[in-house]
Amino acid sequence: MTTLEEPVQAADTVDPCPPGIPNLKTVLSDDASNSSVLEDIDVSNTSSSSSSSSSSSSSSGSCSGSGTDTDTGKGSSNVGSLDVTSSSSIGSETSISSTGSTAIAGPSTLLDDSNSSGLGLVVDVDSNGSSQELSSHGVTELDSLEDSCSGLMIKDGDKLCKLCSLRLVMPRILSCLHVFCEDCLQAVVSKDTMSASSPNSCSSSSFDGSEHQNRLSAVFIECPVCKQETPLGPKGIKALPCDYIVTNILDLSNLESEHIVCTSCKSKEEAISRCNDCANFLCNGCDNAHKYMRCFENHHVVRIEDLTKNVHDKLIIHKPVFCPQHVSENLKYYCFTCQVPTCNDCLLSDHKGSDHHYETATVAEQAVRADLEETLSDTLKKADYCNDAGSNLGSALTELQSQHDTVRQQIEDAYKCYKRMLESIKDQMLNELGRLHSDRELKIMDLMQSMENTMGKLQHAAQFGQRAVDKANSIEFLLLKPIISAQCLNLMEQTPKCDINYQLQFDSKPEMFEQFAREMFGKFQTDHIDSSPKKLGMTQQLQQQQQQQQQLQQQQHQHQHQVQQQQHHHQQQQQQKQQVQHQQQQQKLQLQQQQQHQHNSNNLIVGHRGSSSVQGRLTSAVFSPISLPSSLQSSFDGDTNSVMSNFSMMDSPPQPSSQQQLPSAQQQSQQQQQQQQQQQAVVLQQVQQQQKHQQHQVQQQQQQQVLHQPTSAQSMPQQLGQLVAPQGIVQQAGHVNLNAGPGPNISINGLGAGGPPPSFSMLEYNISRLASLTETMPDTLNDALAVGGGAAGPVPNVVAQVPGGSAVTGAAVVGASHAHQQQSQAVMPASAVTPTQPITLADILSGDQRALNNLQALAKLGLNNNDDGLLLNGSSTEIDFLSDFCMPPATSPSLQSLNPIVGGVEDMGLNNFHAVAAPGTTSVVTGRNKATPMQIRCKFGSLGTAKGQFNSPHGFCLGVDEEIIVADTNNHRIEVFDKMGALKFQFGVAGKEEGQLWYPRKVAVMHNNGKFVVCDRGNERSRMQIFSKCGHFMRKIAIRYIDIVAGLAVTAKGHIVAVDSVSPTVFVISEEGELVRWFDCSDYMREPSDIAIRDNDFYVCDFKGHCVAVFQDDGTFLYRIGNEKVTCFPNGIDISNAGDVLIGDSHGNRFHVACYSREGALQSEFECPHVKVSRCCGLKITSEGYVVTLAKNNHHVLVLNTLYVH
C-alpha cells in the first residue's frame, strides 16, 4: 500500500440523490474529477456502507465517500465525501487515507450531476479506506497515453493550475479565459471575504458554495494572471463555466486501465465498450442490450479497443451535458432568442412560444461556429497587429534612445560650434581693440614727440634772444633782432594743438543676446504641440521669419541667375561681334592679297573662283559642326551666323599677278566676292538638307540594327563610321564626298589643295589637339606607351597600316579589329612614327586608330582612368617606367565614352595570375607590383553611437554563416551584420564587471557551437569572455599573462589561439580557460598584428617585419612569406579554401592584398583604388571570394569583390 502525503479534503453532507441516477457503489471520475462537471446539484448522505466490499455493494442509491487525488493531493468537492482518483492513480494499488485534520467520511454519497460520473469507474472501498486493485499497469503507460492525448488539444502546461501548480481539479473558466481549480478560485474569494481566516483553511474543507453563498460579498474576482475582473453571480464560483475540453481530454487519458467495470449494471463485470449517449461503460450483457433493445436504438456504442486506437485521430469522448434546471435532461437544443442551450423541459417551460426560436444543437452549431470562427479570425488579426505594434514599439524605443543620443550629440556640437563662434568673435574684438588702441597710442605719441621738438626749439630761440638782449650792443642787437623775432614768431605759429579727446569704450547688450541665444540655439521637434498662446506666437514668428528668409534667398538666387543670363547673353553678343569683325578683317585681307596677286588673265581668275574658293569653303564645311552627329551639334542648330562664323574663309593661295591690271583685278575681285557669297548660301542650304536626310537615315539604321543585328557584330569604330556617314559623306579620315543638291559632284580633300589645314570650331580644335598631344612626347615615354603585355611575353612595337592612312602603335593593335591586325607591315619604335597629317575630329569619329590610341594613351598617362587598352599586366619591364607618372584614380566623362572603341584585354591571357581578374578589367600600376583592381561590393558604417555605426573598431571576424561580427571598441559592444551590411543584432553593455564589455578589441567565433570569444580590457589589462551565440554571458577567462591581444583565432578542435603584440608570444587556451600550451616567437618577428590557422600551422603577421611568419602548432618555426616591397606593414591575414594565403595591408592609404601559395610563392595582387583607408584591421575571405576588411580610422567595413576564383 502506498500512502498519500497530501491532505484529504472532507466533503459536506448533501441531500439525497435525485432519481434517474444509477446505483453505483463508488463512482470515480478520471484525473481527480476533471471529467466531472457539477452544476449546483445537491447530494445527500445515505446509509453507511459496510466494512466489506460485498456489504458495500448491496447498498443502493449510495454515492462514493471522501477520497484524495494522488496527482494533485487535493480533494474534489464534486463527489460528495470522497474525492475521485486521477489518471495516474488508476491501475495502481493506492491506499486512501486521511493525513489532514479531517478524517475520511464513512457514508458514501452520490454525485447528483451525471456529468460527474465521468467514465463510471467502480472501485470498492472498505471501512479502512483501502481501495481494490484495478489494474497491474503502472503510471508509465498512462503518462505516455496522456502525452499523446495532450498533443491533440492542449499542452502539458495547460493541465496545471497556475495557482497551486498541480493538476486541474474541476477547472473553472474566468472571463479572461484563464482556467483554475474551483477550490483555488474559492480560496481566492474566501481570502478576500474572510480576511481573518487562515490561508491554509482552504485545504482543510471543501468549498462547494453551499455554506459561503450567503457570505459572498465580492462582486468581482480578479484573475491572478492578467488581473482582469470577472463578475460573480449569486452562486459564486459555482456559476463559472467549466472547461469541458480539458475534462474530456483528461477522461481520455484513463483508457489505459485494463480493469474497468461496467457502470450500467450491478454485475461489476469488466467493461468492453462505452455508450456515448448514456455515458456509461458496458459489460457484455449491457452491450448486447444496447444492440437489441429499442430504447437504446440510436445510442452510439464504441468499444474500448477502438477508443485507444483512435486516440490520435479525434477527441471522441464527450459526456452529455445536463441542464442546470432539469438535472435529468441533457442539453440538446439551442435557443437563438436567448442564446443559451436548452433541454426538452426548458422548451416546454421557459422557452416555449413563437417568441423563442430554437434548433437542435447540431444545426445551431453551424451558425454559431461560423460566427465564432469569424471572431477568432478577427482576434488573430488583432493579435498580429499587436505583435507588429509591439515590434514597432520596441524599435521605436530603440530609435528614441538613438535619437536621444543623436540630439544630445547635436546639442553638444551646437554648443561647441557657438562656443567657437563666440571665441572667434572675442578674438576679433580683441584684435580690433588692439588696433584701435595702437592707432590712438601712435597719434598721442606722435603728438608728444612733436610737442617735445617744438618745446626745444622755443627754448633755444628764447635763450638765443635773451643772450642777444643781455650781451649785444646797439648795432648788434638791431642786426639780430629781425632774425630772432622771425624765428620766434614762426615757432609760435607752428606750435601743435593738444586736443586729446580719444575714448575707447565697449557697448554690449547681454539681455538681448541671451534672448537671441535662447531662440536661435535650437528647438526640439516632437509629435507634441504646445498649445500655449505665447509659445505658439513665438513659433509662428520664427516660422514667418524663416519663410521670409527663404523667400529672400530665392529672390537673390533668381536675381543672380538673371544677372548671369544677362552677362552670358552679353558675352555671346560680344563674341558674335568679334567673330563678325574677324570675318570682315579676313575678307579685307583676302581682298588685299587678291589685289596684289591678281592674274593677268580673266580666265585664270574665273577658274580660280570656280574651283579653289569652293574647294576651300567646302573643306571648311567638312569640319564644321553640321557634319557631326545630332548629339554633338545641338548647340549649332538654327544659328546660321554662328555656323558661318566657324567656317574658314581662307582660299587656296592664288597665283601671283602683275600690277599693271590693277583696276580690272579690283572689278573682278568684287565680282568674285559676290559669287562666293552666293555659292556659300547655296552650299549651306545643300548641307542642311543633307543633314536632315542623314539624321532620318541614321534613325532608321539604328532601329534596323537593334531588330536584326547583334551589338557585337561590328566593332565600335565601324559603328561610329556608319552613324556619322550613312550616305558616304565621311568615307575616310580627312575626305568628304558631298552628293546633294543641284550642284555638281565635288570631291574635296580635307587638307585643301596642298595648303595648310583648315580652321576648326573650338570643340574640334581641342579634341584634335588632345589626340595629337602624345605624338610630341619624349621618345622613351612614347615607346613605353606603345608596349603591352601578352600571354607569352611582351608585345613588340608594331606600326599597323589601317584604312585611312593612319598608324596604330604598340598594344593598341591588340584591341583593334581582326582585319586591322592582319595588315601589320613593319616593326619599329613608336618614336619613329611621324604623322603625315594632323588629327581631325573626322579621324576620331571614323575610328582612326592613331587618334584613338593617342587619346587612350593620354587618358592613361594623365588621368590614370582604368580603361582598356594600353597599361596591361604583362611581363614587360619597360612599362614599369610609367609607375612614376601614375596619379590617383580619376574619371573622365569625355574620354570614358571612348572605352569601347579600343579592344578590351579579354583577348590577352594573364597567365602569371593564380587568381585571375574578370575580363574587361585592367591592371593598376602600383609602387610595388601590378595589382588587379578590386571593386567595392558593399561599404557600411560611420562614426557614431547609433545602430550600425562604429567608433574606432579594432577587430572583426566571420561567423558560422559568414556574418560579419565587429568589435565596436569605443562603443563597448559587439555588432553582427550580414554580408550586405544589414544589422542583425548587437550585444554588450559598457562596464568592467563580468558580462560587460570595456573597449573590446578582438572577437572570434567557435564554429562548432557558435559561441563568441571577446577580448577586452575589464579591470585588468586584458580579459577574455565567452558569450553564447545569442550574446548571453557564459564565463570569463583570466589572461593576465597577455598584455595586448593582437590576433585571435579558434582552431578546429575548439581551442582559442591568442597572440601577444607586446612580447610576441602565441598562447593556446581551452574553452574552459586552461592554458594548453604556448611558445615564444620573438626571435622570428618584431610585432604581431594578426593570426590565421590552417591545419597545424600558425600564420602570424609581422607588422614591423613586413612579412608573415609560419609556425607549427608546437612553436617550430617553418618559413616566412612576403617582403617589404609586397607586404608592407601587413595587418590582416586569411587562408582560402584552396590554401592560398591572403595578406592585406593599407600602406599608402590603399587596401592592398597579396596572394601567396602555402609554400610562399607570390601568385597575384589586388588593390582597391576607389577609396582611401586608414589603419585597416584584419582580413577575411568569404566562400564567394569576397574580401572583408575593417577600416578603423574610417569607422566602416569594406566588402570587396576580388573575383577570386578559389
From Swiss-Prot:
Record keyword Transmembrane helix present: no
Segments traversing the membrane: none
Annotated binding of Zn(2+) 2, by residue: 323, 326, 346, 351
UniProt cross-references to SMART domains, sorted A to Z: BBC, BBOX, RING
Effect after changing residue 1017 to A: Reduces binding to poly-uridine RNA or the RNA recognition sequence 5'-UUUUACA-3'. Abolishes RNA binding and translational regulation of target mRNAs
CDD domains linked to this entry: Bbox2_BRAT-like, CC_brat-like, NHL_brat_like
ZnF RING-type span: 161-227
Tissue specificity comment: Highly expressed in neurons but weakly expressed in neuroblasts (at protein level). Expressed in ovarian germline stem cells (at protein level). Expressed at low level in spermatogonia; expression is regulated by tut.
Chain intervals annotated as zinc finger (B box-type): 257-304, 318-357
Subcellular location, principal: cytoplasm
Family matches, as PROSITE patterns: NHL (PS51125), ZF_BBOX (PS50119), ZF_RING_1 (PS00518), ZF_RING_2 (PS50089)
Pfam families: NHL, zf-B_box
One BP annotation, GO: protein ubiquitination
Function comment: RNA binding protein and post-transcriptional regulator of mRNA translation; can act as a repressor or activator of gene expression. Binds and represses translation of several mRNAs in a miRNA and 3'-UTR-dependent manner, possibly in association with components of the RNA-induced silencing complex (RISC). Represses expression of brat in a RISC-independent manner, possibly in coordination with nanos, to derepress the BMP signaling pathway. Binds nanos mRNA and involved in bam-bgcn mediated repression of nanos mRNA translation. Regulator of stem cell proliferation.
Full protein name: Protein meiotic P26
